[in-house]
Every structure is written in structure tokens, then in C-alpha cells.
Regions:
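Short, low-hydrophobicity acidic/polar segments
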Residues: 1-150, 196-209, 229, 239, ...
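Contiguous ligand/interfacial binding patches
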Residues: 153-218, 222-246
Length: 257
């Protein structure tokens, strides 16, 4: 029997049809524990659909997770986005860049690593999987062209970086079995900068600049936005209230006034 999955995504997180997930599945089979259930004997590649319910199904022949009579003690681990180079689920790469080069014609990469696991005694398809974002959140900054006709850069950072113990940007790994993210010691940054080259002329109305950040607690002294305009002058604004929580999977919007 090919195993399918019902995918519950984080609130507000949308995916395109046929987005790819990785599924690692084991069971006890013929008294052998932790037997890999994938047809490819590795990590199965599953497709996402939302035709009726959010649902994961095998993406191609040979990519299914297969259950057999007598199997038991099932363990399922799933992650998004699928990456063929990921073979060790105790070290899934995570990368949140500290510097972003923004291009008006490109769709910003707002992908957050999603992960889920489930342990069941029997299979009643589809197997429910509840996904959570891994140590990442999204921030959207809305900028009016009446305030900033041309933008060269924007920077988000704590007002008092010296007392901020978190990291807005970092690279590292995520262990899906332990549910733990680990950053590389030298990779952390307390700020994120978006560059617009020699300057980008904002169209009429509001322009939304969105990017991914690491989850963090609101820093002592606050969080600030610094925008450098085309003429070299800067605007600095304090963002959000001290009670704001930037939890994994959350999306925040700040509108420059």
C-alpha cells in the first residue's frame, strides 16, 4: 500500500501546487526495527496538492512510501523544501542571509524550512502530519514612494546591538529527529541589510519588501529600521512594540509612515 499524508501547514503559510517534500519513513518489518519504507530505500519525494485537503502523495513511480502486511511501529519524518542533496536528516541545512540583493523583477525567496514527524501504530491513510517552521519568520516592510522616492538600502537591527543576544541571520543545520536547530558559530548576524544597487525608484503607492529572518525575542531597546534614500540621506524608525513576539513561522508587517 502506498502511504499518503495529510499536511497541516503553519498558519498563513501557502505553497504552490506540486511543491516537493522529503519523507523519511521507517517501521518494524519481519521483526527488523527501523526498516526503511521508501521504494528508493532513501528519502521519498512527495508532491503537495490542495485540491480537497492539503495532501502529500508520491511525486513519481519509485518515490512512494510503501506499507506491507505485518508492518508496525511506524515513524514518519517530513521536511520542505525537498533537496536531493539532503541525505542526513540530523543535519538539514538552514541559511538565513544577512545581506540580500533585491531585484524588482524577481520573486523574493520567502521559503522557510518546514518539518514534521509522526509516530503511529497503524496506517489509516492519509497519515496526518503537522508542519512547523524551523527557527524562521517573515518580515514585510511597506514603503510609500511619497516618503522614499528612491531607495538604496534598508537595514533591520536592534537599537542596542550590544545587549541583543539573538541572531536575525545565521546559517547552520536542523536535526529533525531531535527537533533542534544549531547555528554555525561564525555565521550569526544581528542585522539584515537589503541592497537596491545604485538605487531603485519606487512605483506609485506602497512597495512591499519581504524577507526571512531568524526567530527571536524582541530586544531590549527595540528594533529599528534604517533606510538610505537615493540622495544618501537616511530615515530611522523604531518598529513594533516591546510585547511583539517573532516566533518561528510568524509573519509581521511594518508600514513606514
Amino acid at each position: 500500500m502506498d502511504v499518503s499524508f495529510q499536511a497541516t501547514l503553519p498558519k498563513g503559510y501557502a505553497l504552490e501546487e506540486n511543491s516537493l517534500f522529503g519523507i523519511y519513513a521507517t517501521c518494524t518489518r519481519a521483526e527488523k526495527v527501523n526498516t526503511n519504507m521508501a521504494e528508493n530505500s532513501g528519502i521519498a519525494k512527495y508532491s503537495f496538492t490542495e485540491e480537497a485537503i492539503p495532501y502529500l502523495y508520491k511525486s513519481a513511480e519509485g518515490e512512494a512510501v510503501v506499507g506491507k502486511k505485518g508492518d508496525h511501529n511506524y515513524k514518519f519524518y517530513a521536511f520542505y523544501p525537498y533537496d536531493a542533496s539532503v541525505t542526513d536528516l540530523s543535519a538539514i541545512p538552514v541559511n538565513i542571509p544577512a545581506t540580500i540583493d533585491w531585484k524588482a523583477d524577481d520573486t523574493p525567496d520567502l521559503t522557510m524550512l518546514l518539518a514534521a514527524q509522526a509516530t503511529v501504530t497503524s496506517i489509516i491513510a492519509p497519515v496526518p502530519m503537522t508542519f512547523e517552521a524551523v527557527a524562521q519568520c517573515r518580515l514585510t516592510i511597506r514603503i510609500p514612494n511619497t516618503t522614499v522616492p528612491v531607495i538604496k538600502s534598508l537595514k533591520v537591527a536592534p537599537v542596542k546591538e550590544s545587549v541583543f543576544k539573538g541572531q536575525l541571520a545565521w546559517s547552520g543545520t536542523y536535526d529533525i529527529f531531535e527537533g533542534k536547530a544549531t547555528s554555525n558559530e561564525s555565521s550569526g548576524s544581528k542585522s539584515i541589510t537589503v541592497n537596491f544597487g545604485s538605487g531603485y525608484t519606487l512605483p506609485e503607492g506602497y512597495t512591499e519588501i519581504s524577507f526571512v529572518m531568524g526567530e527571536f525575542k524582541y530586544p531590549s531597546g527595540g528594533l529599528q529600521l534604517q533606510i538610505t534614500k537615493g540622495d544618501g540621506t537616511t530615515i530611522t524608525k523604531k518598529m513594533f512594540e516591546a510585547s511583539e513576539v517573532f516566533a518561528a513561522g510568524s509573519s509581521k508587517v511594518y508600514t513606514l509612515s
